[in-house]
Each structure stands twice: as C-alpha cells, then as structure tokens.
C-alpha cells in the first residue's frame, strides 16, 4: 500500500474517532498511529496534513457536501462516508498537486474498504459533482 493511501486511511480513522470522542487531534493521531504499520512516516505526514486541513476548512467542506448531495442531509449520512467525502473534498479544493481523478479513485477505494456496499457509488456521485465545477489541475 502506498504512503498516501495509508495516510488517507489513517486520516479517515482519526476523523471518525473525533466524531465519537473528545480530544486533541494530535493525541488521537498518536493513538491511531500506534496501531498502524511500522515505517509509515510519509503516510503519517500526509495523514496529519489531511486531518488538519479538514478541521481547518470543515465549514467550507461541509457546505460543499450539502450543496452537492441532493436529497441527503449531512446529519443522515453514514459517518464513514461523510468523513471520506470531507477528506476527498479537502484534496479537491486545497491540494492542487493531486489530480482530481486520483483523489476520486482513492476515495472510492477507501470507501470499498471501510464503507458499506453502497458507499463507493454514493461517494463517486458526490465527488464527480464537486470535481465538475473545478478547473483541471496542471
């Protein structure tokens, strides 16, 4: 598994944990990394950036999800799906170095691993809507 995929998976676990626990992001990050594979420094750095980025821009990210998820209230979305969307939308909006199709494909793969049977299609639909409004990355 690549460092970025691992980073995305760890970031998802951390954001999911934050939905159910009270604590600083850094202490939760340490807890998640204690259970991760050894030798994951690159994944850890990427995961840390993703989590901090999502937390910093959560209001904008959630507004984007609300706008693009027709007939779905954020409060009714599965927490795993919601956090996969938050991570991917952070990448789409704020990481100009990652191609849109890579971000979407990675989110779908993470959804296959952590979500329900319906998660990949749900996430793909919303991310396609978001990506269609963004300029192509150079």
From Swiss-Prot:
Entry keyword annotation includes Nucleotidyltransferase: no
An example molecular function term from Gene Ontology annotations: RNA binding
Domain of life: Bacteria
A GO BP annotation: transcription antitermination
Keywords: RNA-binding, Transcription, Transcription antitermination, Transcription regulation
UniProt keyword annotation of Coiled coil present: no
InterPro entries: NusB-like_sf, NusB_fam, NusB_RsmB_TIM44
Transmembrane annotation, as ranges: none
GO cellular component, one term: cytosol
Gene3D superfamilies: NusB-like
Main function: Involved in transcription antitermination. Required for transcription of ribosomal RNA (rRNA) genes. Binds specifically to the boxA antiterminator sequence of the ribosomal RNA (rrn) operons.
Sequence similarity: Belongs to the NusB family.
Protein name: Transcription antitermination protein NusB
Native source species: Geobacter metallireducens (strain ATCC 53774 / DSM 7210 / GS-15)
Gene that specifies this protein: nusB
């Amino acid at each position: 598994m690549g460092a970025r995929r691992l980073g995305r998976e760890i970031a998802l676990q951390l954001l999911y944990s934050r939905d159910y626990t009270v604590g600083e992001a850094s202490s939760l990050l340490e807890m998640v990394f204690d259970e991760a594979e050894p030798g994951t420094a690159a994944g850890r750095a990427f995961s840390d950036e993703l989590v901090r980025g999502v937390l910093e821009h959560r209001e904008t990210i959630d507004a984007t999800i609300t706008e693009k998820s027709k007939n779905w209230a954020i409060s009714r979305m599965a927490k795993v799906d919601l956090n996969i969307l938050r991570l991917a939308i952070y990448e789409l909006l704020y990481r100009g170095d990652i191609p849109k199709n890579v971000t979407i494909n990675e989110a779908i793969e993470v959804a296959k691993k952590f979500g329900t049977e319906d998660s990949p299609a749900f996430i793909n639909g919303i991310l396609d809507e978001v990506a269609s409004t963004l300029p192509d990355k150079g």
